[in-house]
Design a protein with these regions (language model features):
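Short, flexible loop segments at the rims of nucleotide/cofactor-binding pockets, characterized by
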Residues: 44-47, 113, 138
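Helix-loop "lid/cap" segments that line or gate small-molecule binding pockets
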Residues: 106-115
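FAD-binding core of flavoproteins
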Residues: 18, 100, 119-216
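Amphipathic, small/basic residue-rich leader segments at the start of a protein or domain
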Residues: 1-103, 124
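Short secondary-structure transition/capping segments
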Residues: 80-83, 111-112, 146
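Residues within well-formed alpha-helices
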Residues: 29, 33, 108, 151, ...
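Short, solvent-exposed helix-helix connector turns and helix-capping sites enriched
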Residues: 49, 95-96, 116-118, 179
């Protein structure tokens, strides 16, 4: 006889002044999605470290959840961090990896590019079509990011990245990777983080760009 896993316990109910009809509706929608859609997939894939299916990401995108905090005029829901946390908490109860994927939308990877391109990418982000990975840690640099050894050098009008990263979850399936690299050593009197910059590496899902290799 098969049994159906239940999510227990439930988070406490929202209380005034944070409780609104719209927030309760959003929370209950995410709770039902976590129970009925996410949990069965997690029960099957998580024990064997299986990859999240694209179909699940697409279902989340159809609900608009990758754009919870993106303004409505750019294709998002135009809500705030509170609403994002409500959805994130409910999804995490079923599968923590789903919460991680949710955070990779919300306009990630659009902050430092020109305005014209940013507007288009915000819309893609809200649609779940601009989902990123973040490459910070290295074999010798974990919590101390000032110890990062990856280098970025300017050559012929381009930036050349050279180094090794680790623990960059979702990197293969991502649409882009944000890579932390050092462009120069700190000068006397500067913070140890001086010279660290983030670079946006655009890629095709399932493929690493030329010159980049990976292993599990």
């Amino acid at each position: 006889m098969s049994t159906k896993t239940r999510l227990e316990p439930q988070p406490p109910d929202l209380q005034p002044p944070w409780r609104t009809a719209a927030r309760v509706e959003l929370q209950l929608e995410a709770r039902a999605f976590a129970q009925d859609i996410v949990l069965p997939i997690a029960d099957e894939l998580d024990p064997k470290k299986g990859e999240m299916p694209r179909s699940l990401i697409d279902q989340m995108a159809a609900k608009g959840w990758f754009g919870i905090t993106i303004p409505a005029q750019h294709g998002g829901m135009g809500l705030g961090v509170f609403e994002y946390c409500l959805v994130s908490e409910e999804l995490a109860r079923a599968w923590l990896s789903v919460r991680s994927i949710l955070a990779r939308g919300q306009g990630l990877g659009t902050q430092t590019i020109n305005d014209d391109r940013r507007l288009g990418l915000l819309r893609r982000s809200a649609q779940g079509k601009w989902i990123g990975a973040i490459a910070l840690s290295e074999p010798t640099a974990g919590s101390d990011l000032a110890a990062v050894q990856t280098r970025a050098t300017r050559e012929d009008g381009y930036w050349l990245l050279s180094g090794t990263k680790r623990w960059a979850g979702f990197a293969l399936a991502a649409d882009f990777i944000e890579v932390l690299a050092r462009t120069r050593e700190p000068k006397d009197g500067e913070s140890s983080s001086a010279g660290l910059e983030t670079f946006l590496v655009v890629k095709q899902p399932g493929i690493f760009p030329e010159g980049m290799t990976a292993r599990n």
